[in-house]
Amino acid sequence: MPIATINPATGETVKTFTPASDAEVDAAIARAYERFLDYRHSTTFAQRAQWANATADLLEAEADEVAAMMTLEMGKTLKSAKAEALKCAKGFRYYAQNAEQLLADEPADAGKVGAARAYIRYQPLGVVLAVMPWNFPLWQAVRFAAPALMAGNVGILKHASNVPQSALYLADVITRGGFPEGCFQTLLVPSSAVERILRDPRVAAATLTGSEPAGQSVAAIAGDEIKPTVLELGGSDPFIVMPSADLDEAVKTAVTARVQNNGQSCIAAKRFIVHTDIYDTFVDKFVEQMKALKVGDPTDPATDVGPLATESGRDEIAKQVDDAVAAGATLRCGGKPLDGPGWFYPPTVVTDITKDMALYTEEVFGPVASMYRAADIDEAIEIANATTFGLGSNAWTNDAAEQQRFIDDIEAGQVFINGMTVSYPELGFGGVKRSGYGRELAGLGIRAFCNAKTVWIGSSKSGDAGGGSKVE
């Protein structure tokens, strides 16, 4: 895949970029490693916080310009692109304010371990490679960059090949915010370069957000090198609605949860599991609202759904829907790519889906909603968990017992009750099953790339350092 900005609304190639050479890659790794050796010791939390806040200031001041760039590169609506830029600023501010506290020494009961003092100290690992996707060109990378930099790590970003301008902008804005040269670099390289970078002994760890095959590849390399990783992979999130829910609010939120980011979000709701008593009403209302959405030019403020980011992505969801309908599923609306230039696919609703269909088993990365009828809460949870994925989940009910049941039994990294799954700097983010492992954001995210070092200090008179001959 070429490294290029291709406007998904027109299919026009706007700008192409020359990949970094092997020598340039080596120089970037060397620069990052040398910077880390100094940065981890010579900067304080207060200094890093000043730079993080300055970066946030720039993101806010340049939000309109940045939004236009993201919309051009991957087709998200201008309003959602601006919201993403502002969210990135919020992420930097969160870690500027909280990093020192989140990484403070954690005292242990020294007496119980025979020490004068004992605690856990969090220290940065070093150079972290980030392999990031195109769907949230800035936010996905900032979720790694802000905590990593505040912890004292440095970063190398290998971004998706179709968002090179976004990738270059992020490295530039972080440097303009005051972080020293080499703290955060973008390398415009193909996916084939990832293995070479990750195997370099100067690179300490990796984080990847992307497809399951990409995650498997990075995990295999990192495992061979014994390097820690965080993987945030695909999702096929359930959106469950029970009879006690506020039906109109649930429908409204469900539509937003499905078409956010033109339907291209790992945590978008994709499978709508509705109690049989309200199923028909819910589906009718949902279809009505999906039909009312405006599809078109993502720079038009009136547009609700823009194009898919890539032609192959558009073709893949079209095939998933076509195959399901051919196998007996019912198409309630949408279902055919729009005529004309660009990679547009309309909001689509499919019912009567069976277990042998790709819509049942695969992630659908576009504005396609799959509907399922559940007889009771047991069947709703069974359908929700009948997937290899476990990223986010949503459940709508005003029954306290049902809420607790969903919290306890849904197999996912996140459960949102009477809302839609959203990433917040203040909340840990990640999945289970084939949605990956490790966590981003909040305290979990900043500690993900730290060495949790156990410190045991005996008294100067102690002859039993570390507990002597006690069993490990």
From Swiss-Prot:
Q: Name one GO biological process term.
A: tricarboxylic acid cycle
- Write out the catalysed reaction: succinate semialdehyde + NADP(+) + H2O = succinate + NADPH + 2 H(+)
List the SUPFAM superfamilies hit by this protein, alphabetically.
Answer: ALDH-like
| Keyword terms | NADP, Oxidoreductase, Tricarboxylic acid cycle
Catalytic center residues: E232, C266
What EC number(s) would the UniProt record show? Answer: 1.2.1.79
Residues the record lists as binding NADP(+): W134, N135, K158, H159, A160, S161, G210, S211, L233, E363
Gene Ontology terms, MF aspect: aldehyde dehydrogenase [NAD(P)+] activity; succinate-semialdehyde dehydrogenase (NAD+) activity; succinate-semialdehyde dehydrogenase (NADP+) activity
Return the similarity comment: Belongs to the aldehyde dehydrogenase family.
Q: What does this protein do?
A: Catalyzes the NADP(+)-dependent oxidation of succinate semialdehyde to succinate. It is believed to be the main source of succinate semialdehyde dehydrogenase activity in Mycobacterium.
Q: What is this protein called?
A: Succinate-semialdehyde dehydrogenase [NADP(+)]
Q: Which organism is it from?
A: Mycobacterium avium (strain 104)
Gene name per UniProt? gabD1
